[in-house]
Amino acid sequence: MAPKQPNTGLFVGLNKGHIVTKKELAPRPSDRKGKTSKRTHFVRNLIREVAGFXPYEKRITELLKVGKDKRALKVRQEKVGHSQESKEEERGDVQCSPPDEGWWWY
């Protein structure tokens, strides 16, 4: 859908209507929902660094390194369930090494 054009001040036409300047509103507190604060982000990263990954997460990263994406998703679904999108994003941050140059099936 195309963005709405500003009103022209005319009585007829697609952009009819009185010309007004849009009012700048303060951000609502509900706009922050779902965003983590700097402190929370720092604490979570610190805990991750100290504690490491849970055993099922280690298994998933190993499967991803080998290239078994579908199997890794099934393991995650089995252990965590579908509702944990944040875990999926977090796991995406883990770097998987690319296969060696000698592998001919990639």
Swiss-Prot record:
Transmembrane segments: none annotated. It holds the Pfam family Ribosomal_L36e. Gene3D superfamilies: 60S ribosomal protein L36. Residues 75-106 are annotated as: Disordered. GO terms for biological process: translation. The keyword Acetylation does not apply. It comes from the Eukaryota. Keywords: Ribonucleoprotein, Ribosomal protein. InterPro entries: Ribosomal_eL36, Ribosomal_eL36_sf. Belongs to the eukaryotic ribosomal protein eL36 family. This is Large ribosomal subunit protein eL36. The lineage of its organism: Eukaryota, Viridiplantae, Streptophyta, Embryophyta, Tracheophyta.
